[in-house]
Amino acid sequence: MKALLDLFKQTQGDEQFDVIKIGLASPEKIRSWSFGEVRKPETINYRTFKPERDGLFCAKIFGPTKDYECLCGKYKRLKFRGVICEKCGVEVTLAKVRRERMGHIELAAPVAHIWFLKSLPSRLGMVLDMTLRDIERVLYFEAYVVVDPGMTPEGAMKRGQIMSEDEYIAKTEEYGDGAFTAIMGAEGIRDLLRGIDIDREVETIRADLKATGSDAKIKKYAKRLKVLEAFQTSGIKPDWMIMEVLPVLPPELRPLVPLDGGRFATSDLNDLYRRVINRNNRLKRLLELRAPEIIVRNEKRMLQEAVDSLLDNGRRGKAMTGANKRPLKSLAEMIKGKSGRFRQNLLGKRVDYSGRSVIVVGPTLKLHQCGLPKLMALELFKPFIFNKLETLGIATTIKAAKKEVESQTPIVWDILEEVIREHPIMLNRAPTLHRLGIQAFEPMLIEGKAIQLHPLVCAAFNADFDGDQMAVHVPLSLEAQMEARTLMLASNNVLFPANGEPSIVPSQDVVLGLYYATRDKINGKGEGMVFANIAEVIRAHEAGQVELASRVAVRITEFEIVDKKAEGDARFAEKTKIYQTSVGRAILSEILPKGMTFEEINKPLKKKEISRLINTSFRKCGLRETVIFADRLLQSGFRLATNAGISVAIDDMLIPTSKERIITEATNKVKEYDKQFMSGLVTNQERYNNVVDIWGAAGDQVGKAMMDELSHVDVLDRNSKTVRQESFNSIYMMADSGARGSAAQIRQLAGMRGLMAKPDGSIIETPITANFREGLNVLQYFISTHGARKGLADTALKTANSGYLTRRLCDVTQDLVVIEDDCGATSGVTMKALVEGGEIIEALRDRILGRVCIGDIVHPDTQEVIVANDTLLDEDHVDQIVALGIDEVKVRTVLSCLTRFGLCAKCYGRDLGRGGLVNVGEAVGVIAAQSIGEPGTQLTMRTFHIGGAASRALVASNIEAKSNGALKFSGTMRIVKNAKGEQIVISRSGEALIIDDNGRERERHKVPYGATLLFKEDAAVKAGASLATWDPLTRPIISEYAGIARFDNVEEGVTVAKQVDEVTGLSTLVVIDGKRRSAASKGVRPMINLVDDKGGEVMIAGTDHPVNIGLQVGALITVKDGQKVEVGEVLARIPIESQKTRDITGGLPRVAELFEARSPKDAAVLAKVTGTVSFGKETKGKQRLVITDMDGEANEFLIPKEKQVLVHDGQVVNKGEMIVEGPADPHDILTLRGIEELAIYIVDEVQDVYRLQGVKINDKHIEVIVRQMLRRVQITDGGDTAYITGEQVERSKLYDANDLVIAAGKRPAQFENVLLGITKASLSTDSFISAASFQETTRVLTEAAIMGKTDTLRGLKENVIIGRLIPAGTGLSYRRARKVREQFERDRAQMIAAEEEAIANTPVEIEAEVIAPAGEADPS
């Protein structure tokens, strides 16, 4: 009893424990927790409001309702503490014990715990080896279960057998009364459970496992073995799943609150408990009265149902409802779901010392400041003010101080100023999608009621001033203030952690001002003047002698960085130079920090340029200078924009002159297609696709014409010649600078609105030819409203989906922290530039920046080391590597990091948000999840229908060289020469490479099967030359051998049909679909065999397989029977489906699909081994493909007939090569090609989605997620470890176990990699607290309780839930220091004990000598 109370005592100081264990409570345990039995269903007396004795709120059991006062009021005050009143039996103590003291109910009949019955898989069913249906029938009194066969003959009846009422009666008559025992209800199940000998069961199952060969049985046994072993190791008895005692929750946790008007609000649990008590008491009475069996049975069933409802209402049958027909909230519902205990109260708490208000812009603030309304500050900093008032002696008590503050005397404001100085506060804007959503600022007191926010941090908060609100939090403790100041201050967070780009980029007005000031103009006022310095320029400008945009020459003094190591001015060298520039740029150059050249701003500053400028400043001049520079840029931008006075008029929207013509042409083309459709030349779908194409193209043409007219104007220069210059049109300037609007929006204003989509996403074929300047008619307006509304609906959906993705990502990575500097890994991944279709999508520079290299990087010519092994590659290194034209670099990656239960800094590389090597303790997992989740709302939700123009654009028919060099072919390329001497490609995965003069690969192209190569290997090619061509609409089948074609099973009307071309009148044979053939010819496969002149079969080179070429459905046969066939000749062509509009999952769903590792529908089939392909006997709808490996072992695949098989008889394929077309399955890639290939696949696919939206995310974030998806392995052979085959284990745990086994000289376990989707990976984590707070709480807790799981509190989430510092950042070092300290204390205690023992055992004379050496060793 006492032990339990100690568990609930308020902790004094830091309660130190390292693990939390969960298990099942035995009846004795429940009774030991309890302070008394609850016998009555009464709650409180409605007149006196005092709790009823022995009821659900009984003060005797649960403690007094008022502090230090018994119920009858005999004992009051502190002096009677601990006394038990003899009149009312209440102990005099604190009232808050009512939050921790439990009671119990002694059940009149045992009851099964619903979680272990109904939570799938049913644990009761597993242990008893019975079906859930049977157990339910017994528990709910529909059937008997045999507990003891007794005197019945051998084999007539066995223990655990189920029998219905009628059978029971029949058997009783047959064998006599009392010959055997069969019971109904939980008692029967309990007796069965008690009769199980777990050790023996485990042995039998292990023996069965060894003996059996069937997969289904192995699975079944393994499941049961797992549950039984769990009971064995945890020491939990199976019969505890049946409850004889029910614990009662402390009353304060299920309160009863009086409302005005004499009514009460109560927790649903009280209702549920009342039902249990009522039914239990009634059952007790019935048993005492020896009521008829049927009545007792019904009451027992009702008791079981009442307890079920209390534990998990609605899990079985109908949910119990209260008076208002609403289902009652049971214990299970209290903890699960969004509003359950875990997510509502433990992971998301409300915070004291916080406030919220609307934000307004604060253009005069410095970057690290924010404006805080005085009244808000007064409320938030109250305790500090009280303290100050007392220390100054202005107020004597807190009460007086409170009065002083409330009257807001002048002294209070002075003290507020003082208290607030240098005390950072945190601002947060919901939704907090990444770590920059909370930043610390120094408050400046302001009048008014709105918080002022610095404009430059808006990008990070994603805030604007259209009514956004922000919350303020005050860090109270000194440590918290220090962390807020050093880690969270806005001026210390200038880079996005997602991609390392600056986050303090100006936008809108500022960009417009800077752009306007740095544009130059032909023939402006004062053009051609020369100035000695910037002061002169300013003077001339202010005197009105020169315009802001005039082109002038200025002498400018710059400071170049010469010595990076030096401090202060010693770093720079001064140099002066005359620049051709504009007045605005010269004036702006004043704000450049030292170390930046004038070249950097001697161009029109668009948004991208400004971002680059800030980035350069950060890398060259450091954080402090950059922050000052950004602030100055902001001030200048605002000032210049104001002075510029840019405004917009309707006349600025120029409608292109060619618009009418383009629209007329398009209309005529559409009419032409309508005619063709009417006369039946094209299908309706084709007509629709073409119409949509035409209008799409017309819209683009109008847009282009408009931009051309808008962007340039003709002006006279100084010599009165007409020249074109960029226009100063306001709308164009806004779009061009990146301040507001885009070309697409201007197109709607001044071009044509173009095609609109219906709500279902399909495109309406009549476009809106008008623009907003001309105005829309009613029909056009109506069509437009569709799109606008769909946009809003989509956004709402998207936000929810994106948030859910972020939550899953955070959950899977939450425990990944950098825990050491270097793991010593020597493997990594070789990075190259990303090339698609011969174009570089991502340069090598961006891919290796901020990574640690493996091995020295040497100069390609001189072989001298430029970058040493294990160096973090920064901008300078990368520039050097790129300049030397090195095109691949091996770098460390998160996936090959050897650190267990974490990561090392070297494998992670640069911390993108700070710019140096990542610190130990950084929670890189959560950062990765935020970086991927945060842009989620910008991704699209829809599935793209690709049809018409879009799909036609996808069909390439040749490869063009992009650069000069020598042509090389990859090792997988196989070529034959045909009769014309052309080179025909007969490999599926061949690649053509172009190598430059230095021997470096410039580009790489995939060459499809059947393509004709136009150059020989090693030929020199020029940029723009065509390397290979092919027919994009058909796939050929090419003969690799010469001979005479002999048809096999090619019968007209049976397997092939004659098709006559309408235009040419030529006939060809087409293979018909098996489904459309007659029954007899269903399984027959048409083939072409090659025979030589003598009629013998031509064999495949190096084998004894004849050359049989199978023809697929739809193949057009181009040779005749008996025709002579040359090498490289086309035997048949398979038309590619005229690019059906296929759906491409894009955007958010695609990202989710990749991270959930879902196998795609109709996935590609990859070869499991390297070997030779042949076709076996076909089944009804499938063809059998056999790959025979080098040892002669055959691997069979069954492939649906309608699938495109990419290989043919006799072809040699490599392991992991695609043999059937389709999207790749990540699981196959992992098993056949390994972790590295899988990572490359997932990273590339995810990046494709984000790149399409123009979002930059660093690869390493995606790699971090992939590492977490691979964190479990499957045991293939347990070796001498405790693991069984087929079990899934945490990788780090297995490595640890293997180390121990190897050290002992035994056999380690063998395993294979498993890829888990993020949801599954989160749920399979070793921490049950983390898994339970994520999803499927009931299942997770049920499983954990049976296994008696311990949670080692390794992740961040578990620690947040139990309320201690997270093991990341400062928390990690705190925890390590504590461990060291504890170890030291232990060692010291041992030494002292050893000394004392030594002293006790030593003869007295030589005592002095013994103590001396021990004294030296004392660590203190």
Swiss-Prot record:
Coiled-coil region(s): none
Residues where Mg(2+) binds: D464, D466, D468
Record's keyword terms, sorted: DNA-directed RNA polymerase, Magnesium, Metal-binding, Nucleotidyltransferase, Transcription, Transferase, Zinc
EC number: 2.7.7.6
Tagged with keyword Transferase: yes
InterPro entries with a match to the protein in the record: DNA-dir_RpoC_beta_prime, DNA-dir_RpoC_beta_prime_bact, RNA_pol_asu, RNA_pol_N, RNA_pol_Rpb1_1, RNA_pol_Rpb1_3, RNA_pol_Rpb1_3_sf, RNA_pol_Rpb1_4
CDD domains: RNAP_beta'_C, RNAP_beta'_N
PANTHER family reported for this sequence: DNA-DIRECTED RNA POLYMERASE (PTHR19376), DNA-DIRECTED RNA POLYMERASE SUBUNIT BETA (PTHR19376:SF54)
Description of how the protein assembles with itself and partners: The RNAP catalytic core consists of 2 alpha, 1 beta, 1 beta' and 1 omega subunit. When a sigma factor is associated with the core the holoenzyme is formed, which can initiate transcription.
Role noted for this protein: DNA-dependent RNA polymerase catalyzes the transcription of DNA into RNA using the four ribonucleoside triphosphates as substrates.
Family of this protein: Belongs to the RNA polymerase beta' chain family.
Name of this protein: DNA-directed RNA polymerase subunit beta'
High-level lineage: Bacteria, Pseudomonadati, Pseudomonadota, Betaproteobacteria, Burkholderiales
Gene: rpoC
